[in-house]
């Protein structure tokens, strides 16, 4: 894997978190997505909380966000986040932020 000049930490989700996510993925027939993983390590994404409805979504930008979060499970230093369509693994350092 080339570094490409990125200073992004080369941290991977723990084995325990991956096993937990795989079990849920098999049970609920949902894909596991890691496209928010690196961004969650560098605070480049957040858990957006809509002020009007208290609905939660993962947000990278105004154009990049997930479907509604149905459940957030803590697994060690990570969260396994279930949405309507997918399972995301993010760092537990991810911050909630109010969105409109």
Where are these regions (language model features)?
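N-terminal non-globular leader segments, chiefly Sec-dependent signal peptides
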Residues: 1-78, 84-86, 93-100
